[in-house]
From Swiss-Prot:
This is Zinc finger HIT domain-containing protein 2. Interacts (via HIT-type zinc finger) with RUVBL2 in the presence of ATP or ADP; shows a stronger interaction in the presence of ADP. A zinc finger (HIT-type) spans 7-41. PROSITE patterns: ZF_HIT. The gene is ZNHIT2. The lineage of its organism: Eukaryota, Metazoa, Chordata, Craniata, Vertebrata. The modification Phosphothreonine is found at residue 161. The modification N-acetylmethionine is found at residue 1.
Length: 403
């Protein structure tokens, strides 16, 4: 049944009867031309569905498939809005029937897009907030002047250059990082908390010297999760924090590390094991961004970025805890938030420790790159010998002849 009433988007004096309804807000319209003037609603709907899939495929595939199908047909259609997947009024069965109407090849292609973590390329580019006023050209100079540093080993890129990523086993990092982390406007820098308690007020005894090594692990998860969720969205707050706590053993499992390299490798292992999508940064890119955050804007305010990141984390975890229903989830979020507040107080009083941590992270970044290049070279050689990506079937070397 066609919707009753006039079109809500026709120019004054040219109002036509409405023949269709917007699938998102049910606004009446008469033609494809009028629907396109209402394009923001459709784009927002599409973005919500893609983000829903990125947060762990919790949204039913029928909703995202219908959005993709509708947008594709809309581009191909010029005159007949009915052919663009826009039915007259609510379609029988709603959106759930559109997934079944896709051909098997279309379903497989769409599922490959999600399984490879490439759906993020469909979203607008996003730029980390710590690139806004990064140290940039001074980065190498700071590392060179740091005690015990080896400038020949450390090659952190300028603040406006995408990370020099290599292929991980699970994703092609350079292309994804370049598209999602390109030179585009980014989010505003989070505000550093105005009241940071003294570390002695949060600890009953002496602070362990291993506390510092939890920072790289937490910041790795922070950079990875922000890039994966394109800066985060309150609608995805629960999933954002689930990814954060899943990648960071320091936040999610109260894990302790003996070195910065161990802390980074623990987080990288979670991604390499496939427990979470690699995201646009990948493991190398996330290590690179940890060093950037630890270096801050420069020597005059090196701890600023780390304080801002930890403060942002504490606020985010606090908001998620208020929304959580299950007691176990609330407890996990509470402990993670307390950990961030403790690291915030520690960082505020130990700014001098950030440069050595940044150096350790930069070395771990390069060591990971060397290993990745060696694996890629070995893989290429094996594929050359095999004549393809899989080894040939074993041949029988000795065969007993019948008597």
């Amino acid at each position: 049944m066609e919707p009753a009433g006039p079109c809500g988007f026709c120019p004054a004096g040219e109002v036509q009867p409405a023949r269709y309804t917007c699938p998102r807000c049910n606004a009446p319209y008469c033609s494809l031309r009028c629907y396109r003037t209402h394009g923001t609603c459709a784009e927002n709907f599409y973005r919500d569905q893609v983000l829903g899939e990125l947060r762990g495929c919790s949204a039913p595939p029928s909703r995202l498939a219908s959005a993709l199908r509708r947008l594709r047909q809309q581009r191909e259609t010029e005159d007949e809005p009915g052919e663009a997947g826009l039915s007259s009024g609510p379609a029988p069965g709603g959106l759930s029937g559109l997934w079944e109407r896709l051909a098997p090849g279309e379903k497989a292609a769409f599922e490959r897009l999600l399984s490879r973590g490439e759906a993020g390329r469909l979203l607008p580019p996003w730029r980390p907030w710590w690139w806004n006023r990064g140290a940039g050209p001074q980065l190498l100079e700071e590392l060179d002047n740091a005690p015990g540093s080896d400038a020949a080993e450390l090659e952190l890129a300028p603040a406006r250059t995408p990370p020099d990523s290599v292929k991980d086993a699970s994703a092609a990092e350079p292309a994804a990082a370049e598209r999602v982390l390109g030179d585009v406007p980014g989010a505003c820098t989070p505000v550093v908390p105005t009241r940071i308690p003294a570390i002695v007020s949060l600890s009953r005894g002496p602070v362990s010297p291993l506390v510092r090594f939890q920072l790289p692990n937490v910041l790795f998860a922070y950079a990875h999760t922000l890039a994966l969720y394109h800066g985060g969205d309150d609608a995805l707050l629960s999933d954002f924090c689930a990814t954060l706590l899943g990648v960071s053993g320091a936040l999610g499992a109260q894990q302790v590390f003996a070195s910065a390299e161990e802390a980074l490798q623990a987080a990288a292992h979670v991604l390499e094991a496939g427990e979470h999508p690699p995201g646009p940064l990948g493991t190398r890119g996330a290590m690179h961004e940890v060093a950037r955050i630890l270096l801050g804007e420069g020597p005059t305010n090196q701890k600023g970025y780390t304080l801002a990141a930890l403060g942002d984390l504490a606020q985010t975890l606090g908001r998620a805890r208020k929304q959580a229903v299950a007691r176990e989830e609330r407890d996990h979020l509470y402990r993670a938030r307390k950990k961030c507040q403790f690291l915030l107080a520690w960082t505020n009083e130990n700014e001098a420790a950030l440069t050595p941590l940044a150096l350790d992270c930069a070395r771990a970044h390069q060591a990971h790159a060397v290993v990745a290049e060696e694996v890629a070279a070995l893989t290429g050689e094996l594929e050359r010998l095999w004549g393809g990506p899989v080894p040939p079937a074993p041949r029988t070397l000795i065969e007993e002849l019948p008597s």
